[in-house]
Amino acid sequence: MSTYFGVYIPTSKAGCFEGSVSQCIGSIAAVNIKPSNPASGSASVASGSPSGSAASVQTGNADDGSAATKYEDPDYPPDSPLWLIFTEKSKALDILRHYKEARLREFPNLEQAESYVQFGFESIEALKRFCKAKPESKPIPIISGSGYKSSPTSTDNSCSSSPTGNGSGFIIPLGSNSSMSNLLLSDSPTSSPSSSSNVIANGRQQQMQQQQQQQPQQPDVSGEGPPFRAPTKQELVEFRKQIEGGHIDRVKRIIWENPRFLISSGDTPTSLKEGCRYNAMHICAQVNKARIAQLLLKTISDREFTQLYVGKKGSGKMCAALNISLLDYYLNMPDKGRGETPLHFAAKNGHVAMVEVLVSYPECKSLRNHEGKEPKEIICLRNANATHVTIKKLELLLYDPHFVPVLRSQSNTLPPKVGQPFSPKDPPNLQHKADDYEGLSVDLAISALAGPMSREKAMNFYRRWKTPPRVSNNVMSPLAGSPFSSPVKVTPSKSIFDRSAGNSSPVHSGRRVLFSPLAEATSSPKPTKNVPNGTNECEHNNNNVKPVYPLEFPATPIRKMKPDLFMAYRNNNSFDSPSLADDSQILDMSLSRSLNASLNDSFRERHIKNTDIEKGLEVVGRQLARQEQLEWREYWDFLDSFLDIGTTEGLARLEAYFLEKTEQQADKSETVWNFAHLHQYFDSMAGEQQQQLRKDKNEAAGATSPSAGVMTPYTCVEKSLQVFAKRITKTLINKIGNMVSINDTLLCELKRLKSLIVSFKDDARFISVDFSKVHSRIAHLVASYVTHSQEVSVAMRLQLLQMLRSLRQLLADERGREQHLGCVCASLLLMLEQAPTSAVHLPDTLKTEELCCAAWETEQCCACLWDANLSRKTSRRKRTKSLRAAAVVQSQGQLQDTSGSTGSSALHASLGVGSTSLGASRVVASASKDAWRRQQSDDEDYDSDEQVIFFDCTNVTLPYGSSSEDEENFRTPPQSLSPGISMDLEPRYELFIFGNEPTKRDLDVLNALSNVDIDKETLPHVYAWKTAMESYSCAEMNLFPSPRNVKVQKPEPWYSGTSSSHNSQPLLHPKRLLATPKLNAVVSGRRGSGPLTAPVTPRLARTPSAASIQVASETNGESVGTAVTPASPILSFAALTAATQSFQTPLNKVRGLFSQYRDQRSYNEGDTPLGNRN
């Protein structure tokens, strides 16, 4: 078995290695080369680059040391791999001595050795991966008439697809500075050496000899192998099925894993059907997969995709040229059968969406097929069931369609504007150059567009969208009808005085005579003014000071007839006249009617544009498109696409978006729920252990556990009770005459005492303490302090006894906390009555554990319950935990029984709690008066300093260790229904567009869906989202923050322009807009830091069709939101005026915010140090 030794030399800056007989002694090429021919030694035909470019003439290698040039055998050119393949290892090692970067490897056959010499280590990995060797790369001695020879690596095989060379559709000539517009397409198989352009000929590229001679250098031959293999026929069939099935995610993953699914070895589209040579775009046009077609066109236009295909050796110019070539191929390449382009396929099948995608690219051409027909001539030829609407739309798309866009600057340096109508063949200019600075330009982006439509209709739509209609005579504008503004100025026509008398009616002629200054000037001579200094000539020097005459209105006949009427109309006090005062009711009625009609398109559109810069133009354009029954597309950053979100397709995309977010939240919370289950398991095990310890006190007390660190439990409890006893004694002494205050204070102290006792009972270190004697012990301590107090007189003692008797009688039949108070009062009364006869010692003498135990043994036990649930804070916390556990069980389901687990029953007991809806980990409470009335509690107090929320837990099964006897019933004074107490458990909706809280983008989508009915069955997520959004008030919606920290995504262009448009920045605004009256726009970076009561700002309805406006009115220092009614047109207009004028600058916004916040609180003069000032 023969062995071959291959030497791999990486490509250097000087170029690739070229073999010769003197350098590669002993190689296969050196041994088998033919003898040199001196006659032909003057020049040698050197191989060009492996990219298949035209061969170039090179001189011999200067390293040979002889004047004679080397001889090149056609079978063994200098770049043949056989120059570096040896049969003797010693000969191969000689090459390694001269080239330090060379690598040597042994192979069992010549085929693998050639692959290694050409492509290095990657070829070996490819052989192992695909189980086949690289084909041979031998020269093809085909000599054309011009004397050029094909490159040895220019054969069309699966391994000749080096992105830097073989068969590249476009290549920028070296040293060429011509723009990409100079790249021409040609059908000739060869190119002239003097040509200055690139020619595509049979999928191969050739360099120009003239450029080679002007800038001679070594050919850029890549020694690296192709980074991607050619897909097999079975893989191409599977790829075609994925396209036909509409699996866009799978298609995207396939083409980015291996670009060869879209680009063949000749840098042309890959044929997915060999017979008729259908590429991916033909398949999409046949089955109407517009989204996949948009993805493919966007991908082949992406510089990163071609760079991935080309590799690291490819330049930016090469990638740009390849993008242009591929885009032109995919849009305009005809099939082999009928010579039809993808546009023909989409037009004859009646696929409107596919035609829209294709014609949106300016590179798409309307070519003729073999029958000489263009796509517009075969509309719906293969679709007999096409509707008339479909045919009309296709005709509109194929016959010069026009669109009206919204242009926004990507850096927010320019306000948005309505762009001029354009067609795909003539796209708009997205480079806005400043007038003052010619070198500066601003990049614009299309954020929405309406169309397609005819050019005439597009111009009308553009004028209507850009300039709202003026208010007519019969519809009164709020500015014109308001007494606070001047009359509407009407500019007369310039040609009004040029009309002849015969061309106008007598009425019009009379009006011109009465109201025309020209008529007055021609009918009467103009009086001569008296000029000072007795001269009519004007001196043209600085010494002449001309007096300033008062403003004179032009004299007209009607103004001469009634001069007072004109001035009275403009007098500010004109409304104070008796005549107008008598007609005040008529004025109010007229203004009311005008106000209802004044919310017309003109006023609403201007208000929306000025107040909502982010989406104002889109709101107006969307409504106009619906009125004109035109298609509307709008870019939504969270969907990263242009679409009308109110259509069926848009709602489906929104539903899919919410569904995806739901799945993501479920995946993220899965680990959290698992940890929650584990914690509940540990809690249940701890509860069982504590129960076992309570059953056997003696054994648990003697146990030496790590938690038993307190050796004096009675001393600790005694010291704590002494603190409470001192506070109770102080309260009794200071408030001896106020029984109500003493009752409330004792209730609060006993509530805290219960919390302390519960914590002691939950701790295993205090198991030996008998807590049933707590009331007797604390009464004993209070009696001791009262008896030994010097402040307590005999009269106070008698008064205290009388008060305790009254409290005991009142609290005899009470339960809960009042029962505890009655028990303490009874014990305290008994101690104080027996104090003169019995010895009551001070507790300071109890300093040891033995003395404390002896003192506790003398106390009496009581029947009061010391359950943990009687503590409000503890019970609330445990109830909340139980409700959250119920939500966990509802969302995750019951856990399976695990055999052999010690605490399995306890685990299921802790997890098997009631049911609630998904997402109820955070709950909100809604007021329910009936539920509050049904609650009867024995330990419920509502403190003003603490917001306490209780839930109705009657339908929820609590976990083990929780008691439902007393915590289900609460009671508060019936005369005050507290909103914080009257609550029902409801799940909080937390699925919004950009997180758990609504943003301005949610409001924008809600405006777009305001007139759309959402089906709860088919669109459950959208229905839930819209219901949650509609629950917010207008004041809360004004406080929604703008989406600032949004992931930057590249928007899908609605059309594909030149290569520069593909690298444009996304449409998301990196800067915050400060021209909308939103609280988040006033203070950047703050979230929810505004006042508790938001200032109610006047705000128009969410859509132009609505006319509800809220106005904030001040009444007794409180902000009250009132709805505008027709009876108060002046107030409503003032509010609208304030809405349009108050938010001018960020500083004014902040000032207005804080001033409204301060006005909401009514200060008393006695509360401030400045109250006594005059």
Swiss-Prot record:
Disruption phenotype: Animals die as third instar larvae, are smaller than wild-type and show very severely reduced brain volume. Complete disruption of brain morphology, especially the optic lobe, in 3rd instar larvae. Residues 37-56, 150-164, 174-198, 205-219, 533-543 have a biased composition (Low complexity). Residues 521-532 have a biased composition (Polar residues). The keyword Hydrolase does not apply. Pfam families: Ank, ANKLE2_3rd. Residues 37-74, 141-230, 519-543, 961-981 are annotated as: Disordered. GO terms for cellular component: cytoplasm; endomembrane system; endoplasmic reticulum; nuclear envelope. GO terms for molecular function: protein phosphatase 2A binding. GO terms for biological process: asymmetric neuroblast division; asymmetric protein localization involved in cell fate determination; endoplasmic reticulum organization; mitotic nuclear membrane reassembly; nuclear membrane reassembly; spindle localization. Disulfide bonds: none annotated. Changing residue 326 to H: Pupal lethality at temperatures above 22 degrees Celsius. Larvae initially have normal brain sizes, but later in the third larval stage, the brain is smaller than in wild-type counterparts. Keywords: ANK repeat, Cell cycle, Cell division, Cytoplasm, Endoplasmic reticulum, Neurogenesis, Nucleus. Its main location: endoplasmic reticulum. ANK repeats lie at residues 338-367. Coiled coil: none annotated. It is found in: Endoplasmic reticulum; Nucleus envelope; Cytoplasm. The keyword Endoplasmic reticulum applies. Involved in brain development probably by regulating asymmetric division of neuroblasts. Regulates neuroblast asymmetric cell division by controlling asymmetric protein localization of Mira, Baz, Par-6 and aPKC, and spindle alignment. Also, regulates the localization of kinase Ball during mitosis, specifically maintaining Ball in the nucleus during interphase. Required for proper ER and nuclear envelope morphology in neuroblasts. Belongs to the ANKLE2 family. This is Ankyrin repeat and LEM domain-containing protein 2 homolog. The lineage of its organism: Eukaryota, Metazoa, Ecdysozoa, Arthropoda, Hexapoda.
